[in-house]
Amino acid sequence: PPDVSRWEGREFMGYKRSDGQVGTLNNWLIIPLVFCENRNVQILREAFEKELGYAQPDLYRQSVRELVDQYTSGKSIAHMPHQAVVDQERSSSGDASSRVFPFLDGIKFLTHEGGCGGTREDAQSLCSLLAGYLHHPNVAGATVLSLGCQNAQINMLQEEIEKKNPDFD
C-alpha cells in the first residue's frame, strides 16, 4: 500500500457515510421507477427548486430580452452589448444562504425512459443503475416514485441496493 503518513490527522469538508465511503456533497435524489412518472418528477422539480433555494440562476433571460429590444428598435449589431451575458454569468452564483436545508447541497431530479415494458432483465438493469446512484457517497437520501404496475418494482431496487451495500441506510 502507498505511504499515507503525511496525510494522517488531516481533515476536509466532507461527509463520512456509515459504510465508510466519503462524499464531498450532500445531494437528495428524486427518482422514478418508471418513465410514466417523468411528468410528476418535472412538476416536483418546478415546485421544489426555487422554493427550497436550489434553482439555478436565470443567466440569459435578461440579456436576451435586452438584445431583442435593441434589435427590434433598429440598433445595429455593432452597438449591442456582447459582454453583458458574460458579465451576468460571472456575477451569478448559487446562494446557499437562501436554502431551506443549508446542509443539503442540491436536489437532483432524474428521469429515464424505462421501467415499464421490456424484459425483466431490462428492469433489473435499470434498478441496478438506480441503486448505483443511491449508493453514491454524494447522495444523502432519495425519494423514489413508483406506480406499482411497472416491471421495475421497489423490491427489485431494494435487492440491487443490498447487492451493493447490505447495510445500506
Language model regions located:
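Metallocofactor- and cofactor-centric catalytic cores in central/energy metabolism, strongly enriched
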Residues: 1-169
